[in-house]
């Protein structure tokens, strides 16, 4: 019987890592998310056709994707409640990253459910960091502006 070696999965968040959600909100609502009433913001975005499908890349998003795409990353993206954003996010990924890229959509709090020991998550928010690490995953808290550091950090953890 052959020995099967499972490789760790590299997961990459979408909003704030590859996709510029904040810029999209600013273009649509004339203010950044932190300056808006969240209930009103989500109501407006839900009513905006193809909001997520039409979001721009983050400034370093294409360079980051270029650096990690050969590791076959899986997009692991949190979605707002109501099921209205999943198709848009999948459409963006198919168009910009390729139809062969696996995309998992879920509530942000459920992201750690996809973690196995050694799996890596690149995410701009640290709300699930402790839960990811508790499952023996590796967590890279990503922020724009230091791309070379993050690429080295990803490669070091693979």
Question: For each predicted feature, which ranges?
Answer:
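Short hydrophobic segments within beta-strands
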Residues: 13, 76-78, 122
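Short, structured coil segments at secondary-structure junctions
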Residues: 69, 99, 134-136
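A short, structured active-site edge motif that brings together acidic residues
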Residues: 74-84, 90, 95-114
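Short, acidic loop-to-helix structural element flanking the phosphoryl-transfer center
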Residues: 46-75, 82-87
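Short catalytic/ligand-binding loop motif for oxyanion handling, primarily in non-cytosolic enzymes
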Residues: 19-21, 27, 73, 82-86, ...
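Acidic, Mg2+-coordinating phosphoryl-transfer loop and its flanking beta/alpha structural elements
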Residues: 120-154
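Conserved Lys-Pro-Asp/Glu-containing loop-to-beta segment of HAD-superfamily phosphomonoesterases
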Residues: 9, 104-132
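Active-site neighborhood of HAD-like aspartate-dependent phosphohydrolases
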Residues: 1-49, 134
């Amino acid at each position: 019987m052959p020995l099967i070696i499972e490789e760790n999965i590299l997961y990459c968040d979408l909003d704030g890592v590859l996709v510029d959600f904040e810029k999209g909100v600013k273009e649509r609502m004339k203010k950044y998310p932190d300056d808006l009433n969240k209930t009103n913001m989500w109501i407006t975005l839900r009513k905006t056709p193809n909001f997520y499908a039409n979001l721009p890349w983050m400034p370093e998003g294409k360079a980051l994707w270029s650096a990690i795409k050969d590791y076959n990353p899986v997009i692991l993206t949190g979605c707002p409640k109501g099921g209205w954003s999943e198709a848009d996010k999948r459409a963006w990924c198919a168009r910009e990253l390729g139809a062969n890229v696996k995309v998992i959509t879920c509530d942000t709090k459920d992201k750690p459910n996809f973690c196995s020991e050694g799996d890596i998550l690149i995410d701009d928010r640290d709300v699930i960091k402790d839960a990811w690490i508790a499952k023996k995953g590796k967590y890279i808290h990503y922020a724009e502006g230091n791309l070379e550091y993050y690429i080295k950090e990803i490669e070091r953890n693979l």
